[in-house]
Regions:
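N-terminal secretory signal peptides that target proteins for export/translocation
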Residues: 1-4
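Sec/Tat signal peptide C-region and signal peptidase I cleavage site
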Residues: 19-23
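Mature catalytic domains of secreted/periplasmic carbohydrate-active enzymes
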Residues: 24-512, 522-559, 565, 569-571, ...
Length: 603
């Protein structure tokens, strides 16, 4: 009875007259508005069911469907951009798209090999597209014949094979399910080329297809890690809650991500490829992809390097999140070999440093110029991206005493110079993706979050730690090409008589630094005057039009252009506490967005 009451929302039906009228507008917005694509964020605790996610800091995401058979090409033409959206991008009629299933026969699919690759890469759970926006189920479904078992010559259920392979190899397994968009169905959101907008009944879609299929996924594949929802769009709070309750009633330990919509879910999924600049509270993840698209595309060989993937993984973990990296198998069921080779190289590094990744805590420090830090109990792991040429790795802000220091397992010496810990490392960088210095402390971590500027590094002043007057930190999201999301945290909204951002930090020794400003400027603020004050240094300079592209809704509302301008030299004649203030010199320049200030040593 309790279970029936929880899911009864969908049995009884809810009046959705307003939803039908909104469907066309919402479908268009889902092409490029991040709020509609991903829903509201916010810290989530996950309660007891989310405890395992901290111990699974690295995961595999898989986009696989009928779009994989097309590989980004339709009717002799390549549709550039994320290829899993090809049905909508090419406006393929649902009847024509159904025929793709007639030739979809992924005989190279081997569940054990996929899971072994994830395991070799150091990943601990897998999420896969059970149904993406195209509406095709990659599992056997009684709710719709448009599924891989009934509609293709393959006739197998790869989700059952993957679920079993994950159990055999000790990985958790979960499903992606597109709850709002389904381009195969009149009653769902997204297909406005086959179906007249405003004629569908979204509640009927939920009742007849989405809920029955989600119930199948929760009932037929054993214990699952969770259901990964996406693009909530116009789904109502009651509908979102109904789906959450459905998942938790059938599998109480399964997680629901925040893209269920309306502020619900057990953990937060950030924007595609979004890595926060500073630590973030709660349970969260960053979904990223190994190349540019998510599903297989015949032309996309823009693979991220092993070092880039490892650094992105470390950045996410050091901020307190889980990094979920996507692969896109092709229409035959094979993960591209070049991608697999890159993942295995990443895995060799992860397996050598598992204690610094899985189950690790975020950094206790402020921004570190040379890299990132993760922690576990009384141990710190320093991930060094910029290797010190003088053999001295400098760490400021650590008050705890160091018992032992090791670099890739070998002992290294440390010394104190005032408030600074100096770690003596070889002049030659170790041959590994990211060298890791392990500091075993004599007691609990006692550290300051004060930022530092180091002479041997390219230093960034993070927007989130500045003291602000008459401006604010705003997230800027856009797509360079369709589906290729970019994210920046910018100083923006310059208003009032006093407008400035001030950073406090420490320098370890005297030095001179170039100041680079990365910004975007619309035409109306061209040649606006700006200034920097830092000790005895005062700089005045113009910021000029960066040539932003006019607004296009299909590209996230705008296509901003950022440029970097070297505005002058800042001198620090003495080490110690410093303050740098940046802001407009006049009353104009209200629309300029500043994404980074960098201090680069003068050499």
């Amino acid at each position: 009875m309790k279970r029936r009451m929880k899911v009864g929302l969908f049995a009884g039906g809810i009046a959705l007259a307003a939803l039908a009228a909104q469907a066309a507008d919402q479908a268009a917005a889902l092409d490029g508005t991040s709020a509609e694509m991903w829903g509201p964020g916010g810290a989530k605790t996950g309660q007891a069911r989310g405890a395992w996610l901290k111990d699974s800091r690295f995961a595999m995401f898989v986009h696989w469907g009928l779009y994989s058979e097309l590989g980004g090409r339709w009717d002799g033409r390549t549709q550039y951009g994320i290829s899993e959206w090809i049905m909508r991008r090419a406006q393929i009629p649902a009847a024509a798209y159904e025929k793709v299933a007639d030739r979809f026969n992924p005989t190279n699919f081997n569940a054990a090999e996929w899971v072994q690759l994830a395991k070799d890469t150091g990943m601990r759970h897998i999420m896969i597209t059970a149904k993406h926006h195209e509406g095709f189920a990659m599992f056997g479904s009684a709710a719709s014949p448009f599924n891989i078992v009934d509609a293709t010559p393959f006739k197998r259920d790869p989700m059952k094979e993957l679920a079993q392979a994950c159990r055999d190899q000790g990985l958790r397994f979960g499903f992606y399910y597109s709850q709002t968009q389904d381009w195969h169905e009149r009653d769902a959101v997204g297909n406005d080329w086959d179906f007249k907008p405003g004629t569908g009944d979204f509640q009927r879609y939920l009742r007849t297809k989405a809920v029955p299929q989600i119930r199948e996924l929760l009932s037929n594949y054993g214990p699952i890690a969770g259901v990964w929802f996406d693009t909530p769009g116009p789904i109502t709070p009651e509908q979102s809650k109904g789906l959450v309750d459905l998942v938790h009633s059938l599998q109480p330990q399964a997680l629901v991500n925040s893209r269920i919509g309306n502020g619900l879910g057990d953990y937060e999924t950030l924007g595609d490829q979004e890595i926060p600049r500073l630590p973030r509270a709660g349970l969260w993840e960053t979904p990223d992809t190994a190349n540019d698209t998510w599903a297989y595309a015949w032309y996309d060989r823009a693979w991220k390097s092993p070092t880039e993937i490892a650094e992105r993984l470390v950045r996410v973990v050091s901020r307190g999140g889980t990094y979920m990296l996507n692969v896109g198998p092709d229409g035959t069921g094979r993960i591209p070999e070049q991608s697999a080779c890159i993942l295995r190289e990443v895995g060799r590094w992860v397996h050598a440093h598992e204690e610094a990744i899985h189950g690790a805590d975020p950094t206790p420090f402020g921004p570190l110029a040379w890299g990132e830090c993760t922690a576990r109990g009384n141990t710190l792991y320093l991930h060094v991206f910029q290797w010190p040429a003088d053999g001295k790795l400098v760490l400021t802000g650590l008050r705890s005493k160091v018992r032992r220091a090791r670099l890739e397992g070998d002992k290294v010496k440390t010394s104190r110079e005032g408030h600074v810990l100096v770690i003596r490392v070889p002049d030659v960088r170790p041959d590994t993706l990211i060298p890791v210095v392990t500091l075993e402390l004599e007691g609990p971590v006692d550290a300051s979050r004060e930022a530092s500027v180091l002479n041997g590094c390219r230093n960034s002043l993070e927007m989130g730690v500045a003291a602000l007057k008459g401006c604010e930190v705003k997230a800027v999201n856009w797509m360079e090409k369709f589906g290729d999301w970019k994210h920046m945290e910018c100083l923006a909204g310059w208003q009032g008589d006093e407008r400035s951002a001030t950073w406090s930090f420490a320098t370890v020794e005297p030095g001179s630094f170039y100041l680079d400003v990365e910004y975007s400027c619309p035409a109306e603020d061209d040649y606006s005057e700006w200034g920097v004050r830092c000790g005895d240094t005062a700089l005045t300079f113009p910021l000029i039009d960066t040539g932003e592209r006019p607004t296009r809704k299909a590209f996230g509302g705008a296509l901003p252009r950022f440029r970097t301008y070297r505005v002058g030299v800042v001198d620090f004649p003495k080490p110690g506490a410093q303050r740098l203030t940046f802001g407009p010199a006049g009353r104009d320049a209200t629309a300029i967005r500043v994404s980074a200030l960098r201090l680069v040593p003068v050499k």
